[in-house]
Design a protein with these regions (language model features):
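Rossmann-fold cofactor-recognition segment
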Residues: 15-30
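Catalytic helix-loop patch of NAD(P)-dependent Rossmann-fold dehydrogenases
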Residues: 65, 70-73, 84, 93-135, ...
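Mid/C-terminal beta-alpha module of Rossmann-like enzyme folds, strongest
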Residues: 180, 187-202
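NAD(P)H-binding glycine-rich loop region in Rossmannoid oxidoreductase-like domains
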Residues: 26-66
């Protein structure tokens, strides 16, 4: 977001290519260490993940490399240069069978490969990063691909659209999550945070 342009320098992103953008395979510890040692960032924000829930079931090894080993590598590198690590996680670290919201003090109980690999990533961050923020978010949406845009597109080509109606959650704006990250990284309030917008829908 442009409002942060004055005090934040973006080094890496997984959504853009071109001049001034450096790509990084977070599953490659040597590549991660090389770049982080060269750049010496104050803060590393990890938004990378294999988020295709069904795909994670079919590609466990890849999901584990990206969702668990990647965060581990970033945590090791962050500690090496004294950087803070912001790790974006998910509500899928919980089974999702309860009707009431979960807190940061509840014990994770993932049932999907996605949730299990994301939880392992969290555990690696807690083990290897000295200064970390783990933000569990849910139903994230932004200007890119999102559920609402998908449904509008599908509705234009289908007379009837079927979706699940027994799931409840709090749709969370990517902009609001970015504001939360920006706020937290300026503090020393390390730990696990549940970061979603208010409200509930299904």
């Amino acid at each position: 977001q442009k409002e942060y342009a004055g005090d934040v320098t973006f080094i890496l992103t997984d959504v853009a290519e071109g001049e001034g953008i450096t790509s990084l395979d977070i599953t490659d510890i040597d590549a991660v260490m090389s770049l982080v040692l060269a750049q010496k960032p104050d803060v590393i924000i990890n938004c990378a993940a294999l988020t295709n829930v069904d795909g994670c079931e079919k590609m466990w090894d890849l999901a584990y490399k990206i969702n668990a080993i990647g965060p581990r590598n970033l945590a090791i590198a962050a500690t090496a240069v004294g950087a803070k690590l912001v790790h974006v996680s998910t509500d899928y670290v919980f089974a999702g069978t309860e009707r009431t919201p979960r807190t940061e003090f509840d014990t994770p109980d993932p049932i999907s490969a996605y949730g299990k690999t994301k939880l392992e990533g969290e555990q690696f961050v807690r083990q290897f990063a000295e200064k970390f923020f783990i933000l569990r978010t849910a139903w994230l949406y932004g200007d890119g691909k999102n559920f609402v845009k998908t449904m509008v597109r599908v509705a234009k080509t289908h007379d009837e659209v079927s979706v699940v109606c027994d799931q409840f959650g709090s749709p969370t704006s990517a902009v609001e999550l970015a504001k939360m990250i920006h706020f937290l990284e300026g503090t020393d309030n390390y730990g696990i945070f549940h970061a979603t917008c208010e409200g509930e829908t299904n």
